[in-house]
């Protein structure tokens, strides 16, 4: 599914044009209202600067938090406008509302190269309902549309899908284009062998991904809390480890499917156990057939790390989604950190394509200081998963075809 992208438009298309850009500025704030991680803002800079440099008038639309369709003073985009002004080295004005006469007057008064940030689109319930009247009001700010919000592309909302009915061309920004290139490329036409490392605490949240990857991968490695559902399905004692009792049959099915398709499915052979869910719990390493009593598994063990590393060494493309253990506790972060280091090394020294597919694995890689070494780090959580599941993202489908 090839979509028209911003890179195909030059100054003749953009000069003097008002361009509505949907960005993902849903950044974390601390209690003082200060941004604690500006990754998502920085990720949109290439698209914004391209438009500035090509003399467009830039109008940014974004959501922040979950204000439930009403104005919430704590969810205004004021700190985002301030940080964006710093990053761009020019003033970014913020409207009081994303629609209405006052906001439209502000967008109409822009000069070439100016940037205006519309206030939180989710202050209106119509945004998430994909209300076309609301979408038309948003679209009235601009002549054309760029979607650069991969993190919201799996939502059919007014600012991601509805506006494309009223603005043409509607194209992908640089970030969205890069996400599609890596994530779709990895599942549609990867350099093989292709491996997926799937972690996280629950099988239920990764069923779609595992099912879809079984049709595409040569190897799948599973870590995180979900492994105990697989072990219990095999009839093993898992002590007090997390288990989804209603997913035992599903775990059996996934193992059987992998076998039938000739996909190498690797589960840890040893785990790090804890006597309680706490950063300073007592811990011990155990083989998976020797877990008992009040112990719970919180990380994969050293033998499993070696097995996973050896399996990954043969691969040309690796997708990682979800941590190997409770990496927020240093004592149980070894598995996750080892995978992060292994991928960084493979990326740097063996030209392996390493894709970190959103969510907690991104946080883990950043915590380990290895983000720069990966081929691609996805900015979308749910959107990454849905793309890896082979689903069509509404915000992408709505753009003009190339």
UniProtKB/Swiss-Prot annotation:
Annotated ATP binding sites: 206, 297, 328, 358-361
- InterPro entries for this protein: Phosphoglycerate_kinase, Phosphoglycerate_kinase_CS, Phosphoglycerate_kinase_N, Phosphoglycerate_kinase_sf
Recorded superkingdom = Bacteria
The answer to whether the entry has keyword Ribonucleoprotein is no
- Top class in the EC scheme: transferase
Instruction: Give the signal peptide as a residue range, or say none if absent.
Output: none
Membrane-crossing residue ranges in chain numbering: none
Q: What is its EC number?
A: 2.7.2.3
Does the keyword Repressor feature in the UniProt annotation?
no
**Catalytically driven reaction(s):** (2R)-3-phosphoglycerate + ATP = (2R)-3-phospho-glyceroyl phosphate + ADP
* MF term (GO), any: ATP binding
One GO CC term, this protein: cytosol
Set out the biological process GO terms recorded for this chain's protein: gluconeogenesis; glycolytic process
PROSITE patterns membership? PGLYCERATE_KINASE
Question: Which coarse location class describes where this protein primarily resides?
Answer: cytoplasm
Identify the SUPFAM superfamilies for this entry.
Phosphoglycerate kinase
Describe which pathway this protein belongs to, using the record's wording: Carbohydrate degradation; glycolysis; pyruvate from D-glyceraldehyde 3-phosphate: step 2/5
Q: Which UniProt keywords apply?
A: ATP-binding, Cytoplasm, Glycolysis, Kinase, Nucleotide-binding, Transferase
Q: Which locations, inside or outside the cell, does it occupy?
A: Cytoplasm
The UniProt annotation places substrate binding at: 24-26, 40, 63-66, 122, 155
Give the similarity note: Belongs to the phosphoglycerate kinase family.
The record's annotation in PANTHER family points to: PHOSPHOGLYCERATE KINASE, PHOSPHOGLYCERATE KINASE 1, CHLOROPLASTIC-RELATED
Subunit structure as annotated in this protein's UniProt entry: Monomer.
UniProt protein name: Phosphoglycerate kinase
| Lineage, broadest ranks | Bacteria, Bacillati, Cyanobacteriota, Cyanophyceae, Synechococcales
